[in-house]
């Protein structure tokens, strides 16, 4: 599984760079995790940025009901064409969900995590949620179990979560100020009563804090998701970040608001915009010195299947997976995982070799590059086939993951669509180069005209990025 090394090629024409510019951002201030914690998340693609290059996850949609109404959410139970939280193609019973997991565990042996994240709240549907976990824990003990919740009912179920060996819990926590919460939540339903405004937000916050503390006491890892909403909580998220760290969260995922009008959410229908890439990164960077930040979130559907950035859910719709025999094979899965871990060791050695001797220099400007990758920590995807680009920051001595940016794939039916290409250019306009396995002459020339160079390679991301940077830095 050693990554092939074939070198790289850079477009011959090199636009002059501004030495004092760079990307105007900084991801260098990071918080490292201790070795024991890294071992616990080593195969969890949502909790580990490195693992998401190699391991897959799946969500099962067994929890339709929700006990709060967020202004950014509109749950849909029969939707196949939207990619966002709260959306599924179909609901499942716990038994159907368990069957689906066993089928996919055989078809995709690198799938290591089963999560329940909706389309409502798992803890507003406790019987279905815990029955599903019980079935999977019994039949597929090597699969990690995790759930995502708004936290309202979390204090009541931490003991049950611990009993089932659910080691990873995500809480969506958008504010620690009830007045701000009143602008985010339409209502909160608690103990058979519906609360609105700041009162509802206060109750939710109290239960979130209680739940977070209870998770810490139970030694259950907690990630906090926060939706960044410009003009409402964007300037407040640094305070949220400090508070959740004090309460025991180990990872913070600040996500952009999705507010397209066609999704039918309150914010979408009232014109509330989401943050720009620059605004999102600025807030993430402000928080990065306080605790570990998650930057590789894909804001998945509640029935997502596959690697992050790869949704294979339509391959396993109910009419299909119910006709498939479970192929779960513990020994085969372990063999696949051993191969992945061997490759990860080789990849780590390759990265260390690339970075060896690279001294950090304050004078080196930082730049962004876009990567076309199918996973594995490699530049290994054709430009025209990419449905997203991973963006990295490079400064000559370090290569740091920044974000992913979704695009429509350029080559459809063998031809490139002009509107799609224009959108790609807009999406990666702040990047100095796009690193791909292959690209046609026409899009290469058009990118160069837009000030974006191309590098063709099939190699370790860090190696290709640093080689480009060295050439770029020479002017």
Swiss-Prot record:
GO molecular function, one term: lyase activity
Amino-acid positions noted as binding S-adenosyl-L-methionine in the UniProt annotation, renumbered to this chain: 72, 120, 172
Record EC number: 4.-.-.-
The Radical SAM core domain, residue ranges: 52-303
Cofactor: record remark: Binds 3 [4Fe-4S] clusters per monomer. One cluster is coordinated with 3 cysteines and an exchangeable S-adenosyl-L-methionine. The two others probably act as substrate.
Keywords per UniProt: 4Fe-4S, Iron, Iron-sulfur, Lyase, Metal-binding, Nitrogen fixation, S-adenosyl-L-methionine
Domain of life of the native organism: Bacteria
Bias (Polar residues): 1-17
Binding site for [4Fe-4S] cluster 1: 66, 70, 73
Stretches that traverse the bilayer: none
UniProt KW Lyase keyword: yes
CDD domains: NifB (cd00852), Radical_SAM (cd01335)
Needed co-factor(s): [4Fe-4S] cluster
GO biological process terms on file: nitrogen fixation
SUPFAM superfamilies tied to this protein: Nitrogenase accessory factor-like, Radical SAM enzymes
Residue numbers spanned by region Disordered: 1-25
Pathway named in the protein's UniProt entry: Cofactor biosynthesis; Fe-Mo cofactor biosynthesis
Binding-site residues, [4Fe-4S] cluster 2: 297, 300
Annotated family: Belongs to the radical SAM superfamily. NifB family.
Database matches in NCBIfam families: nifB
Stated role: Involved in the biosynthesis of the iron-molybdenum cofactor (FeMo-co or M-cluster) found in the dinitrogenase enzyme of the nitrogenase complex in nitrogen-fixing microorganisms. NifB catalyzes the crucial step of radical SAM-dependent carbide insertion that occurs concomitant with the insertion of a 9th sulfur and the rearrangement/coupling of two [4Fe-4S] clusters into a [8Fe-9S-C] cluster, the precursor to the M-cluster.
Protein's name according to its UniProt entry: FeMo cofactor biosynthesis protein NifB
Species of origin: Nostoc sp. (strain PCC 7120 / SAG 25.82 / UTEX 2576)
Taxonomic lineage from the root: Bacteria, Bacillati, Cyanobacteriota, Cyanophyceae, Nostocales
This protein's encoding gene: nifB
